[in-house]
Amino acid sequence: MKNINITRKITQGMYALTTQNGGCIVDAVSQISFGKNPLISVAVMKNNYTNQLLKTNDKFAISILGKEVNPEIIKTFGFNSSRNINKFERVETTKIEEIEIINNSLGYMICEIVDSIDNDTHTLFIGKLIEADVFEDKEAMSYQYYQEHREEILKA
């Protein structure tokens, strides 16, 4: 028997994925290589508008969210479509390499898209790390922490 619930035990974080003209909250981000040109992967649901945007852009950014993140970031990027609103008008950002970075984050990674893989529900975008910085050395928010504290985070 295949018990898919075991996948919930895979450690994941909470991230704001941004590209030109939009972004969303993601949890499936991974460093897939080290060395001179590290590769970062991010999985984005196919029915998410940000997925469409990534297919027409050459870069994306990942802002790492901390446990003390401003709840507006999760509300704005997690429960609204960039097709309908300008998310960057609702949260404080800084533009780096033509991509908006979330100011109230632990840090960011900007990647140049080098490949993508489609499956039935998601597209895996693979990017070469071209710019990164750490803003704060605090604890990152895990997906498990978010699920366990979701109500209190979202009502703040």
Predicted regions and their residues:
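Basic, polyanion-binding surface patches
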Residues: 1-156
